[in-house]
Amino acid sequence: MAAKKDRVLWADDEIDLLKPHILFLQDKGYEVVPVVSGQDAIDCCKEQSFDIIFLDENMPGLTGLETLSHIKEIAPNVPVVMVTKSEEESIMNQA
């Protein structure tokens, strides 16, 4: 019987650029579900369970922070790692 793989949801509008990181995690035994928008991330959280979520802050449509608030209503105990290129302290404090 195969061991359960930890499941990662990764939401980023530039997900194609993250392919090497996704492949690395998959090689380490993680199941990675990539999505390209905040709404896609919310929909996935409604349909599936995840062990951790990587969430880009700067996405078209819902921002990462807006998406985070919806995800925390659906799956309050799942850890979320906010990912951003921005060094604005206000974004870090809000997250």
Predicted regions and their residues:
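Non-catalytic signal-transmission and effector/linker regions of two-component phosphorelay proteins
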Residues: M1-R7
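Two-component/phosphorelay signaling modules centered on CheY-like receiver
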Residues: I15-V33
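Acidic catalytic/metal-coordinating carboxylates
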Residues: V36-D40, T63-E66
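Short amphipathic alpha-helix used as the core "switch/output" element in two-component signaling
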Residues: D43, L65-A75
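Active-site beta3 strand of CheY-like receiver
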Residues: Q48-F54
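Receiver (REC) domain active-site loop signature in two-component systems and cognate sites
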Residues: M59
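Alpha4 helix (beta4-alpha4-beta5 surface) of REC/receiver domains from two-component response regulators
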Residues: E66, E87-A95
